Each structure stands twice: as C-alpha cells, then as structure tokens.
UniProtKB/Swiss-Prot annotation:
Positions where N6-(pyridoxal phosphate)lysine occurs in the chain: K240
CDD domains, per database record: KBL_like
Subunit structure: Homodimer.
Pathway the protein takes part in: Cofactor biosynthesis; biotin biosynthesis
Cofactor: pyridoxal 5'-phosphate
Binding annotation for substrate: R23, H135, T354
Swiss-Prot/TrEMBL GO biological process terms: biotin biosynthetic process
Taxonomic lineage from the root: Bacteria, Pseudomonadati, Myxococcota, Myxococcia, Myxococcales
Similarity annotation: Belongs to the class-II pyridoxal-phosphate-dependent aminotransferase family. BioF subfamily.
Catalytic activity: 6-carboxyhexanoyl-[ACP] + L-alanine + H(+) = (8S)-8-amino-7-oxononanoate + holo-[ACP] + CO2
Protein name listed in UniProt: 8-amino-7-oxononanoate synthase
Length: 397
C-alpha cells in the first residue's frame, strides 16, 4: 500500500523521464562475458569492466566455489569482531606484494574505500585536491572528510601547483583516478608525485580501471610509470579486471594500521565474503602467469582506437580499454544505444550526472575475451547508426 509521504516521488520520476535521465536495470545472463543475453537476445557486450575476461573464468569460479565449501558463503561479521577469516589475510598479503607495498587492507567495494579513506587522513583543518573528473565516490569521500575540497581542472598540473602553493591547510591530500572511468585517459602520475614531494602533500591514486591492465606485472599505472614508491595510498578494486568483488588499499604498514581504526566503512561493515577473496586470489595468479591477456587486450584497443578516430571521435588521449564515444545530448546517446542494440551490440548510454551536461556518450569497454571481428563489427554498426541520430541542438544566436 502506497504511503502519502512518498507521493512527491511520482513527479520526480516524471521529471527524470522528461530529461532523459531516468535509469533502469537491465538483467543479463547467463554470466558475464563478451556475449550476453539481454531481453532474450544474444548481444556483444561492450559495456563491462571485465577487462581480462576473468569474471567467468573456470579457475576463478572454482576457487570461489571451493572457498564457499571451506569457509562459508559469508563472513558473518566485521573483520574487527569475528569476521577475519584466512582468505582475507592471504589476499591482503598477495595484494601488498603485487603493489610493492608493506601492507594492504580489504574494503567491501571501491565506493566504500573512496568514501572512507580520505576521512581517515584529513579533516576540518586540512585540504584535499581532487581532479574535476574523479569518480563520484572520490568526491563523496572528500566531502565526508570535512576537509576543504579544492577541485582542479582535469589533469592540469600547473593549476594544481598554484593551488598547493597558496593553501594554508595543515595537511594536504591530492586524489586522482589513475584511469578516468568515463574518458579512458591517464593521470599524469609522475608530475603529480613531483608536486606532492615539493609541497609535502599525500598522494592518493585510485587504480580501479588500471589494476590488472597496465604495467609489466599488471599492477596498474603507478607500476607502468615506475612511481609505486611515490604514491602514498594505492586504492584498487577486485571487481573489474580481476573479475571478483571488493576493493583494497595498499601502502605503508602504518597507513593500514590507521585505517583499521579510522576508516569507518571498514570498521562498520561485514567483511568481504570468503568466495570473493578466493576468486580474487585466483585472478591474481592468472594476471601473473598470463601476460598474453594484456597483450591481446591492447592489440584490440589499438584497433578500436584507430577505428573510432576514423569516424571522427576524439580518442587520442585514451590509454586504456575505455573509449568515450561522445555524442552530446542525452537523446543522441540514448538513440545510438537503442539503434546499436537492434544490430546486436550491447552498449549503454552514459548521461548526466555521471558525465557533464552536453557530453552524453556511449562508454565502449573492451575485454581480452573479445576478438577482432567483434571490434570491426561494432565500428561498422556505429558508422551505420551515426547519420540517423537526432541532430545536435543549434547554439543560441
């Protein structure tokens, strides 16, 4: 029975519909992969973060099933109470070694980590400097910290240098995505590390879309650029390239010791399920022993990048499996997604507030499980769809 106190929601939903901003769930099946069933149809999946094709890998699935049999489906409690099981410590040790750091700490999700870690490091008398295109979870974590939030232009090292020089904050924290999730480009980590060294600031890097994908050992952008030792807080996720679930922070042991007491999402959340930890451990073994997956992935990326450039899209800065096909209005992005679906391609329209107004897009994401024919087929379908999209609105005279 509907309650009158919620009657206002109907008008909100109508307003979202009118703006093309209402969201909905889209069940897929039977499992994550390069081809999925959506609404009873087989579609090529170009909107997943399963960059290495590990979410349905038999070894990863078997590890999860074995852990469920040995340790149970869930942890039953927070780590600090009665939920600290063997798979947690084993995974943290492996993650710390992978990232070349002293210690690591698991979180329930990337959002949990980003929402909780900044507040453990900075507060009211401090300042946090955040790239304007950082993930929403970073923005929320910065706001929750109660430190002054200073947002600098995207990858603009010069502007950040001026902001750091002028601040009177007690402690300074610079936070950036390694790979920006809606644009696919990379942060200038070397230059950011130089600035942090010069101004005594902490450097926090979210490697959610880089870990497993970049670097000689797949450990991320910091590894690829040789700056792992200059990043104070390495955050990453287990549910993208590693195909599992959860997140982690790696760094000095004293950092992890502080987070054990101060990171509220860690303290007040039930621990990750043991099967998720075991799946991530198995995925890390694949990352270590099968670098050919990354080689294959980036060969496909080069093919996609060249094809999108030929179609007129600005993808020159892309340094990852994420390709922004920016179409402008919400209507154009929605129409493109619908037309591509009719042709057998599953790619979602990304709209505000996820991206700035006027930059609605298709976020095309590749996996090592795709093949060249699928890349070429998508490019051909996109070329066919573009002329039939609604026209861009004319700028005011």
């Amino acid at each position: 029975m509907a309650r009158g106190a919620l009657d206002w929601i109907g008008a909100e939903l109508v307003a979202l519909d009118a703006k093309g901003l209402r969201r909905s769930l889209e069940p897929i099946g039977p499992a994550q992969g390069p081809v999925v069933r959506v609404g009873g149809r087989a579609l090529v999946n170009l909107c997943s973060n399963d960059y290495l094709g590990l979410a349905a890998d038999p070894r990863v699935r078997a590890a999860a099933a074995d852990a469920a049999a040995r340790f149970g489906a869930g942890s039953g409690a927070a780590r600090l109470v009665a939920g600290d099981l063997p798979p947690h410590g084993a995974l943290e040790a492996r993650l710390a070694a992978w990232k070349g750091r002293e210690a690591a700490l698991l979180f329930g999700s990337g959002y949990h980590a980003n929402a909780g870690v900044p507040g453990a490091l900075v507060g009211r008398d401090d300042a946090v400097f955040s790239d304007v295109l950082n993930h929403a979870s970073i923005v929320d974590g910065c706001l929750l910290s109660r430190a002054e939030l200073v947002r600098y232009r995207h990858c603009d090292v010069e502007e950040l240098a001026g902001l750091l020089a002028r601040t009177r904050a007690r402690r300074k924290l610079v936070v950036t995505d390694a790979i920006f999730s809606m644009d696919g480009d990379a942060a200038p980590l070397r230059e950011l590390a130089d600035l942090c060294d010069r101004h005594g600031a902490m450097l926090y890097v979210d490697e959610a879309h880089a870990a497993g994908v970049l670097g000689p050992g797949g450990a991320g952008l910091a590894e690829a650029l040789g700056v792992q030792d200059r990043v104070d807080v390495h955050m990453g996720t287990l549910g993208k390239a590693l195909g599992a679930f959860g997140a982690y922070v790696a760094g000095e042991r004293r950092l992890v010791e502080l987070l054990l007491s101060r990171a509220r999402p860690f303290v007040f959340s039930t621990a990750l399920p043991p099967p998720a930890c075991a799946a991530a451990l198995a995925a890390l073994e694949v990352v270590a022993t099968e670098p050919s997956r990354r080689t294959r992935l980036f060969a496909l990326c080069a093919r996609m990048q060249a094809g999108l450039a030929r179609l007129g899209f600005d993808v020159a800065r892309v340094a990852s499996p994420i390709f922004p096909v920016v179409l402008g209005t919400e209507a154009r992005a929605l129409a493109a997604a619908a037309a591509l679906r009719e042709r057998g391609w599953f790619v979602r329209a990304i709209r505000p507030p996820t991206v700035p107004r006027g930059t609605s897009r298709l976020r095309v994401a590749l996996s090592a499980a795709h093949d060249e024919a699928q890349v070429d087929g998508f490019l051909a379908a996109l070329a066919e769809v573009l002329p039939g999209l609604p026209p861009e609105p004319r700028p005011p005279a």
